[in-house]
C-alpha cells in the first residue's frame, strides 16, 4: 500500500515539474502578408519584435500617425504606440510599373492624396476618401500595400460597372496587385489610408 501511495506521489510531483515547460512559449510573430515582393507585419503595443531579413522597410504607426522609411529594418524595438503599427519589409524583387494603356489616369497623384515619402523603392501616399465624392476611374500601374486608419465602407466599381463594398477598420492591411482599374466611393463612416506603391 505504501509503495502504491509513494508511486502516485512521484507521478504527481513529476506532473508539477513538467507542467510549466508544457505551456506555450512566446511564438514568433507571424506576418500578415508574405509574397515575392513584401513581408508585412502587424504589431500591437505588446510586441515590438519581428523576424526580419534586414531588408529596407516602411514603418507606419497608426496613432499618433508616423510614416518612415528605413534602409535596413531592425528586428526589435519598434514603438507600436497605443493603436499598433505596420512594418512593410521590402524584398529584393523590383517590378517596373506597367505601361498605362487603359485610357484612365494612374491611381496617384489625385485630389485628396498627400505624398508622404518617395525614393527608389516606394511611393507612399496618405489618402482620405470623402462621402459622396467618388474617385476618378483610375489605373493601378504598381502593386500596393494599403493600411487603413478608420472605420468605414468603400464601394469599388470597375469599368464594366461591377461593384463590391468592402468594410474597413483601423489596422486592416491589404496587398493589391497592379493592372487594375476602378473607382471608389465612401458609402459609410470614414476612410483614410496609407498607401504604399511598390516600385
Positions of PLM-derived features:
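Positively charged n-region of N-terminal signal peptides that target proteins for export
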Residues: 1-4
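Bacterial N-terminal signal peptides
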Residues: 7-17
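Boundary at the C-terminal end of the N-terminal hydrophobic targeting segment
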Residues: 20-24
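N-terminal targeting signals for Sec/Tat export/insertion, comprising classic cleavable signal peptides
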Residues: 29-54
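Glycine- and acidic-residue-biased ligand/ion/polar-headgroup-sensing regions
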Residues: 49-67, 140-160
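Ligand-binding loop in jelly-roll beta-barrel domains
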Residues: 55-57, 72-93, 151, 177-199
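Short acidic-glycine-tyrosine-enriched beta hairpin
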Residues: 61-74, 161-179
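Surface-exposed beta-loop interaction hotspot
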Residues: 79-124
Amino acid at each position: 500500500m505504501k509503495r502504491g501511495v509513494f508511486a502516485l506521489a512521484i507521478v504527481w510531483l513529476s506532473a508539477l515539474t513538467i507542467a510549466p515547460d508544457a505551456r506555450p512559449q512566446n511564438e514568433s510573430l507571424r506576418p500578415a502578408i508574405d509574397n515575392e515582393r513584401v513581408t508585412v507585419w502587424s504589431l500591437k503595443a505588446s510586441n515590438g519584435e519581428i523576424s526580419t531579413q534586414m531588408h529596407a522597410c516602411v514603418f507606419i504607426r497608426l496613432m499618433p500617425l508616423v510614416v518612415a522609411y528605413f534602409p535596413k529594418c531592425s528586428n526589435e524595438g519598434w514603438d507600436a504606440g497605443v493603436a499598433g503599427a505596420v512594418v512593410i519589409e521590402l524584398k529584393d524583387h523590383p517590378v517596373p510599373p506597367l505601361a498605362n494603356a487603359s485610357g484612365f489616369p494612374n491611381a496617384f497623384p489625385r485630389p485628396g492624396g498627400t505624398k508622404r515619402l518617395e525614393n527608389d523603392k516606394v511611393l507612399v501616399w496618405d489618402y482620405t476618401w470623402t462621402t459622396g465624392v467618388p474617385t476618378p476611374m483610375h489605373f493601378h500601374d504598381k502593386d500596393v500595400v494599403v493600411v487603413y486608419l478608420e472605420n468605414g465602407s468603400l464601394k469599388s466599381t470597375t469599368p464594366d460597372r461591377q461593384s463590391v463594398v468592402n468594410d474597413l477598420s483601423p489596422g486592416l492591411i491589404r496587398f493589391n496587385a497592379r493592372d487594375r482599374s476602378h473607382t471608389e466611393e465612401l458609402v459609410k463612416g470614414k476612410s483614410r489610408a496609407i498607401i504604399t506603391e511598390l516600385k
